[in-house]
Amino acid sequence: MSGNREQVFPTRMTLGLMKTKLKGANQGYSLLKRKSEALTKRFRDITKRIDDAKQKMGRVMQTAAFSLAEVSYATGENIGYQVQESVSTARFKVRARQENVSGVYLSQFESYIDPEINDFRLTGLGRGGQQVQRAKEIYSRAVETLVELASLQTAFIILDEVIKVTNRRVNAIEHVIIPRTENTIAYINSELDELDREEFYRLKKVQEKKQNETAKLDAEMKLKRDRAEQDASEVAADEEPQGETLVADQEDDVIF
């Protein structure tokens, strides 16, 4: 029992502190439980979206590979060199923002195309222009899917770690802090009850002692009164015959 409670002095002030702590622990448990449920729900949604994004990525990359093969066939094998030489500024860009989910900030990545930059407008002008344009569109969708997948996987990793930490806190509060606090409160209540019983027994003994002393004093006073009354009766009895003798003597004198 002592190992499952806190080492405290059993006083009423400590009891009040433990009750406040228990109330705070219950509130914290409720909040963390709701937070864990909200994060778990979002985690499952992200997991489903990751599966969908991976399937979409597979289809897009397969289409992109065929499109690149068509471009290579239509324009020649040096298309890669031409593309690298044409690029000066990134046209496809990514911006990041943060989303607050139950106090957890998740990084969100969004891709966008700068319409003012178009370094590939002359690529494929000689031949294969249609295939090059189609490949550009397909690979743009592929990059968008990659950015979406990266955003989801980043959120997945963050949520996974936060959920583990939150669940550990929930379990610690539920199985350690709350039981220890309840055991401490029960211990303090039992000790205070024992102190109350001891105090009641002590007061009862003091009251009995006072009652015995009062009864003893009353008995002594009664005994003194009885003795005084008895002495007064004896004195009265001794004085009464002398008065009768005196009267008798006077009567004898008158008759004689």
Swiss-Prot record:
Topology of this chain in the membrane: Peripheral membrane protein
Superkingdom as given in the UniProt entry: Eukaryota
Protein localization: Vacuole membrane
Record keywords, A-Z: Hydrogen ion transport, Ion transport, Membrane, Transport, Vacuole
GO biological process per UniProt: endosomal lumen acidification; Golgi lumen acidification; proton transmembrane transport; vacuolar acidification
Residue numbers spanned by region Disordered: 211-256
InterPro entries on file: V_ATPase_D
Listed Basic and acidic residues bias regions: 211-230
One GO MF term attached to the UniProt entry: proton-transporting ATPase activity, rotational mechanism
Cellular component GO terms, alphabetical: fungal-type vacuole membrane; Golgi membrane; membrane raft; proton-transporting V-type ATPase complex; vacuolar proton-transporting V-type ATPase complex; vacuolar proton-transporting V-type ATPase, V1 domain
Main subcellular localisation: membrane
Signal peptide span: none
Biological role stated in the UniProt entry: Subunit of the V1 complex of vacuolar(H+)-ATPase (V-ATPase), a multisubunit enzyme composed of a peripheral complex (V1) that hydrolyzes ATP and a membrane integral complex (V0) that translocates protons. V-ATPase is responsible for acidifying and maintaining the pH of intracellular compartments.
Other remarks in the entry: Present with 8500 molecules/cell in log phase SD medium.
Subunit relationships: V-ATPase is a heteromultimeric enzyme composed of a peripheral catalytic V1 complex (components A to H) attached to an integral membrane V0 proton pore complex (components: a, c, c', c'', d, e, f and VOA1). Interacts with RAV1 and RAV2 components of the RAVE complex, which are essential for the stability and assembly of V-ATPase.
Similarity-based family: Belongs to the V-ATPase D subunit family.
PANTHER family assigned to the protein according to its UniProt record, in alphabetical order: V-TYPE ATP SYNTHASE SUBUNIT D
Protein name (database record): V-type proton ATPase subunit D
Source organism (scientific name): Saccharomyces cerevisiae (strain ATCC 204508 / S288c)
